[in-house]
């Protein structure tokens, strides 16, 4: 009976987290989410403009190998073949692991008083903007929009949401309010961890 009661309690806690606690937490941190999304979108614009006015910028950001491979795929009429160039299982785990790591860094870098999270969001936004403009410049905008956003909408959203979790944690150190700095950090870190846990089904 004791084991059964514990199982029911655990299941109830699980349901409460997903149905009540997480939605309320996301609502209470919508300001940080808006800031994270704003940083990312500004970075996308910066990346696109930089690629427009500096033809070598995309190579600087993405690397010569990636750009050359994409150009070769475009010549072959398969501009988005980069997402299918690996065996399906390897590609899946490679993409998933990379998204998890970027999202984790976006959150963990909040320990650097939120500035680390800003850096991760800026870096990834600039990469996306530069690569998107590069594909536009090559005349494959339509294919790139389908390929990148069909493949990456959830992943990009996860990075932004994880970034908001990093801002929640970092801001708790910068702005403790009526709490001690340590107590505020603990509260902020716990909120951030819960937000990141909410992303697990998306990976």
Name each region found by the language model.
Residues 129-201:
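Hydrophobic alpha-helical transmembrane segments and adjacent short intramembrane/lumenal linkers
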Residues 49-73, 123:
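Interfacial/capping segments of alpha-helical transmembrane domains
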